[in-house]
Structures are given as structure tokens and as C-alpha cells.
Amino acid sequence: MSEAIKNRYDFVILFDVENGNPNGDPDAGNMPRVDPETGCGLVTDVCLKRKIRNYVETSKEDAPGYRIYIKDQVPLQRSDAKALAYLGVQGDLKAAKKDDPTLDGKIRDFMCRNFYDIRTFGAVMTTFVKGALNCGQVRGPVQLGFARSVDPILPQEVTITRVAITTEADAEKKGTEMGRKYIVPYGLYRAEGYVSANLARKTTGFSEEDLALLWQAILNMFENDRSAARGKMAVRELIVFRHDSELGNAPAYKLFDAVQITRNEGVTVPRSYRDYTVTVAEPLPAGVTCLRMG
């Protein structure tokens, strides 16, 4: 494995949606998530991490060191079993730990070495937690917050029709079937994230190669994830703040506050990324540099 990163990073993701549903709320009939007090749209951190995982899985195709632990419809025990088989562990995990007190660390290192998303985001590995192993919970160096739209959004419920009929009985009664879908006409969303070099060194071994793949995955996370429900989505810009040290040279909030998004003059209802201007206030704190990608 490559050496762990030595620098802390904080970053801002700007992405937009046009005539789509960026993240449906199952508790609200799959309506786009909205902050009820402000009317601003929300996208969960879990949703964004899923996009990143999907991109890595697609681009790396299960290459050694880049497997994905959290997969759709795949039991986690299958991946857990690979670690136990590699280490020759059979039967009761508590008994195995008594025989080998270093078993916790060995399992954790195997999982971090082989699964990119554990190395990046961490994981709760239930099999090992139930076996009373300390390696069952791994805290990852990369963390994301919820994305929030820059301006309030107004979700619309669109009625659609289908010419196909489901059953023979329905065919005798009606000629079409009705359906509904939610869309956001336009919304620019902002998400903020963190990369801890300290956790990378102490826990998962997240490397410079992993970091480069993370930036690539963020920039392209919607490019291979198209669907009729999501409409037109794109990452417009990734703004990265690099610290000259492991623990950082400035509080993250000061760097995030430096990223300012304003509506252009005369724009009352934004319908395009071109309706906004994005700036990074300077000078930045000493020991911090900014890289803008996208």
C-alpha cells in the first residue's frame, strides 16, 4: 500500500439539477428533500457517498485494493468472510481473539487494504461488532455533510401517462394509466466535506492515489448515474483547500465562508448555473492553498 496522505483538506462541491429529483424522501412519497423552514433543497451525505462508491466500482471494476464494501443488494457478510478466510479464522470470533490478541488489527488492516470505501469513509462491520472485535467500527478520514441548495426550491409534481396497460382486466376498462413524478425545475446545491490526514495515518492508510481518485469520482459522480428520475445533474465545480500540515492551518468554517455564491444582477428566478457567480475571497489564511476543479 502507498503511504498515507500528510495534508488535511477541506472542500466544497457545487452541483446542480435541472428538471429532476436529486434525492427523494421516502417519508414524503419520494418528493425532493426540503428544509421546511427555509424551502431550500437537501441532499443527504449518504446519497453523495453512494454516487462516489458507484463511480469507483465502475471505473476500477473490482481491482485489488479498490473493491466496494457497501454494495446494493449484497450481504456484508460475504466481504467479512473474505477477511476471516484470509487470516484462517474459523468458528467463534471471541475464541479466535483469545488465541490471537492482534486479530482486531489484522482484520481492520485487511478490510482497509482491500475496500476503497472503508479506507475512505470508514464502516460499521456488523459481523465483527457482534464478535466483540474492536475492528468492527472504522472511522474514515473523508466525511461529507448534507448538500443544501443555494436558493429555495419549488418541487413540482408532474402527472404522466402510460399507454401500456398492466393486466387484461385493466385493458377492458381503460386505455391508459396515470402516474406522477416529482421534479425540481432548477437548483444549485452546495456540499462541504473534510479529509483528515491524521485519521488516514492512524487508521485506514488513505493515500495520495486514493485522494486523486476521490476528486475524480466527485467530479464525475453523476456522469454514469443517469436516470429519468434525476433529470440533468452535473458537478459544476470542486473547490479544494489544501493545508500545509496534517492537522490544518485554519478552521474549516473560515475556508467555507470564503466561498461565496451570488446571483447575477437581474436574476430573480435562477434557471442555470450561468445565473450565479462563484468567488473565493482572498487572501486565504497562511499555509492554505486553493485548487478549483471542474
Descriptions of predicted regions:
Residues 1-294:
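RNA-binding basic/glycine-rich loop and surface signature characteristic of RAMP-family CRISPR effectors
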